[in-house]
A protein has these predicted regions:
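Catalytic core of pol beta-like nucleotidyltransferases
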Residues: 1-27, 33-39, 49-107
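Short beta-strand->loop micro-motif that forms the acidic, two-metal-ion catalytic signature
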Residues: 44-48
Length: 107
């Protein structure tokens, strides 16, 4: 990973620790997690929250700050958010399997 990529990862981690609820998880997945990203590659994030269902308010509160951070850094940050229960229901999907295999927990 380049120095710039390490700096971006650190800023994402710090933001997650600042804003996410205590029992939330933040995972990096995709090319940045696999360390095969190109300079123009985006940053794929998975946010896992407690609760029954993700609401529009959850999206605004937990997802938008990461998108905004990407804008300020000139990179694309693409967070997806699920509750732990919703995420477990996706266990049979290739997406779930890929994230669980290659994901890097940031906080």
């Amino acid at each position: 990973m380049s120095a710039q990529q390490l700096e971006i990862e650190d800023l994402i981690r710090k933001l997650g620790k600042e804003i996410l609820p205590e029992h939330a998880k933040l995972l990096l997945f995709g090319s940045q997690a696999r360390d095969d990203a190109r300079p123009d590659s985006d940053w794929d994030l998975l946010i896992l929250l407690e609760g029954e269902k993700v609401s529009n308010e959850d999206f605004d509160r937990w997802v938008f700050p990461f998108i905004s951070l990407g804008w300020s850094l000139g990179v694309e940050i693409n967070p997806v958010v699920y509750t732990y229960g919703e995420w477990q229901q996706r266990q049979i999907t290739p997406f779930y399997k890929n994230v669980m295999r290659e994901g890097v927990e940031l906080c």
